[in-house]
Amino acid sequence: MIGQAPAFWSRRNSLMGWVLSPIGALVGALTLKRMAGPSTGVPVPVICIGNPTVGGSGKTPTALMVLARLQEQGARPFALLRGHGGRLAGPVLVDPQTHTAADVGDEALLLAQATPTVVSRDRPAGAAHAVALGASHVVMDDGFQNPSLAKDVSLLVIDGEAGVGNGRVLPAGPLRAPLAPQLDRADALLVAGGGRCADALGRLAHSHGKVVLRGQVRPDPSVIATLEAGTVLAFAGIGRPQKLADTLAAAGVRIGRLQPFPDHHPYQPSDIAPLIAEAARERWQLVTTTKDHVRLADRRFADMAGAITALPVTMQLDAPEALDDILRLAEARAAARS
């Protein structure tokens, strides 16, 4: 869990990035050593949606897309998460009617609205629990750098605008480990959006022999239609809050102001009440992400919920058939393990 990314993470020649790079080299080496550790498998295909950096890249919309495609094919996939921001160690099957973000984390609540979802800090135990409950596939949202659960396919997601920042490893930059060896351990790269880094990322992945997918995060048009006539006050506590503003602006919505919060921020009424007051004063609509909105789904915010609009988004691939190829690869590898 991180707050706002330091500005120097996006600057190639920053002094702070250079000063911290020896620590980053150590962190990267330790992470790569950990990634080479032993794994435990389960008797169903395991598909990991990961990213090589910290912060928002579009993993959760990608996981939802993969889960939806498997469901369309008649499968019964389960989502598996560590449960960032939640207190439960698991394994536990998430119940959106009784669990809160404080229990299982915001991402798990969001995924549980679409498919059976297990939260477990011990990923092999979580996957085994999902299989015992009837999972045909396990789709991991994050966990690429954790070797404990054997993965049949790993799909990395990188934002096409942010890329990998300054290309350095934590804390000198946003990478969790050096990019090249992370790519070598993946099967495919999804470049989310057509930003300034998109083409270079695609070329790099191709040079490592990886399948490259291109996709766009699209907002729900019915919700956008309710926002187009006015101005919005947007707030978000995600890896890249600016992404919400960019999505709204690209859809033609006027933004009065963006209020960022740290990733996975545990909202309090004292955070939200001033935003509601400001929006009312300025005659703006208050809008946030679905991931933020699930953190407001408890009785402390009961009187505030009606004033906040959640903006659902979906990941849409430029070539959807490429996803089917990746899913078939996962199933073939799982069958070969059996």
From Swiss-Prot:
Stretches of the chain forming a coiled coil according to its record: none
Keyword terms, alphabetized: ATP-binding, Kinase, Lipid A biosynthesis, Lipid biosynthesis, Lipid metabolism, Nucleotide-binding, Transferase
GO BP term, pick one: lipopolysaccharide core region biosynthetic process
Catalysed reactions, semicolon-separated: a lipid A disaccharide + ATP = a lipid IVA + ADP + H(+)
InterPro entries: LpxK, P-loop_NTPase
Single GO cellular component term: plasma membrane
Binding site for ATP: 53-60
Pathway: Glycolipid biosynthesis; lipid IV(A) biosynthesis; lipid IV(A) from (3R)-3-hydroxytetradecanoyl-[acyl-carrier-protein] and UDP-N-acetyl-alpha-D-glucosamine: step 6/6
Record-listed E.C. numbers: 2.7.1.130
Presence of keyword RNA-binding: no
Pfam family, any one: LpxK
Molecular function GO labels: ATP binding; tetraacyldisaccharide 4'-kinase activity
Family: Belongs to the LpxK family.
Classification via HAMAP family: LpxK (MF_00409)
Protein name: Tetraacyldisaccharide 4'-kinase
